[in-house]
């Protein structure tokens, strides 16, 4: 049960999609088209792209789902490592030192999964048949998930928590002996 089959499929789709851009332009066979860069000249003038078949749509959908599954796997592993960090954080002082390692491991998993998702999304947007808006929504969702994870871990470790301590000011002078605002005498 290998997991690398979809990389081969993604590479094939990318090769088919970018083959025209990577190959050198064909040389003209007749001298009539030489030197003309105006649109409307040449053998492919007015040729529309081939229609997208159901098989192409299914391939794009499968590639998107495999790509999202890879990110979710990394994110799940990051959450699992962070959960182990929370458990060890509560154990003892030695557990707190181990917890920082688990939080770091969880962060590496979340960051690596998010970065590989964003890079893969940028590289395979064409074969996935994603619009720019769809790709931007995917990137936004990944960034939001990573930010929520970072905020949760930061709040748990107390890094973002503000400790406000109310300390009465004592400048060395005592209040005048006399009744307070309610008219009661001072305590003895």
Curated annotation (Swiss-Prot):
Cellular compartments annotated: Mitochondrion inner membrane
Origin: domain of life: Eukaryota
Membrane-traversing stretches: 102-122, 135-155
Biased composition (Low complexity): 29-38
Protein's UniProt name: Transmembrane protein 160
Topology in the lipid bilayer: Multi-pass membrane protein
Transit peptide segment: 1-96
Gene behind the chain: TMEM160
Keyword Transit peptide: yes
GO cellular component terms attached to this protein's record: mitochondrial inner membrane
InterPro entries registered for this protein in UniProt: TMEM160 (IPR026801)
Residue ranges, annotated region (Disordered): 25-52
Family: Belongs to the TMEM160 family.
